Amino acid sequence: MARRFGVVAAHGKPEAVELADRIQRWLAAHQCQIANEEALPVVWPELDAIIAIGGDGLIMRVAHHYPDVPILGINVGRVGFLALAEREGWERALHDLVHDRYHVQEGPTLAVQLERGRSVLVDAWAINDVVVRAGYQLIEVELYIDGQFVNTYPGDGMIVATPQGSTAYCMAAGGPVLTAGVHGFAVTPICPHSPIRIALVVPEQATIEQVYVSDREARLIIDGEPVASLERGDLVRVRRGKQAFRLVVLPGTNFYEAFRSKFNFQIRPEAQPSRRTRNADTPSGAR
């Protein structure tokens, strides 16, 4: 049976659109069935994978629209940490894809509800993170884990991040990077007005609740998209989501090498390992 792949490109990047056209011609020449962006809403449940040509934003949008379908990201953005193949190596990546030389890494998602009194104002899910974010003034957020009060955090807000989201806003705010295989979520205060700046890593089974206890402007942000303004007493409840974020992982993918190169994390650029290291095909904690 012919393999079936969807192809989506970032429309704002001419180089991505041009590469998408080349990829579709290549797939057709290798006896694969192709679904372009217009056909995806109908055929997506039948696809072997979706090839997303762009950056991390495009990959997350595709995952939101077509949950549980494996995604191969080809990076034509800047950092592109979720895009595990680079533009220069697209043909080799497709060879591995069509010949089943890959595995699928499943990452957890976040189910989020915003409750105001007895009303549920937001019922959504996130791939990377759920953020309570201040406007221009300090706010206060109460944090509860599994019903137990942790603390009240004065500052700019709070981030709850998945492993794949931990290398995004969470890391920038000083939170931990969670590698794949860590079955937990990072809870990171944003610029807390305190000398104690401690992020938490909680189990995937935990229920994370944030109660907004300020009268100042703040928003609920899901995967970078503002979805609601917050009022005093609002409750943001976060649990593990039902959906899975599925990435196509190609042979030779190495999370730590990608982490060094894409985030310029080389303290000494000339540093080399003193012993042989093995290639790890599983990228831990992709963003």
UniProtKB/Swiss-Prot annotation:
Cofactor(s) listed in the protein's UniProt record: a divalent metal cation
UniProt entry tagged with the keyword Protein biosynthesis: no
Gene3D superfamilies: Probable inorganic polyphosphate/atp-NAD kinase, domain 1, Probable inorganic polyphosphate/atp-NAD kinase, domain 2
Catalytic residues in the record: 56
Annotated compartments: Cytoplasm
Family according to the record: Belongs to the NAD kinase family.
Chief subcellular location: cytoplasm
Gene Ontology CC: cytoplasm
Function in brief: Involved in the regulation of the intracellular balance of NAD and NADP, and is a key enzyme in the biosynthesis of NADP. Catalyzes specifically the phosphorylation on 2'-hydroxyl of the adenosine moiety of NAD to yield NADP.
Record keyword Transport present: no
Lineage: Bacteria, Pseudomonadati, Thermomicrobiota, Thermomicrobia, Thermomicrobiales
Protein name stated in the entry: NAD kinase
Protein's gene: nadK
Alphabetical UniProt keywords: ATP-binding, Cytoplasm, Kinase, NAD, NADP, Nucleotide-binding, Transferase
GO molecular function, one term: ATP binding
The organism's place on the tree of life at top rank: Bacteria
Reaction catalyzed: NAD(+) + ATP = ADP + NADP(+) + H(+)
One GO process term, biological-process aspect: NADP biosynthetic process
EC number(s) stated in the UniProt entry for this protein: 2.7.1.23
Binding site for NAD(+): 56-57, 61, 128-129, 156
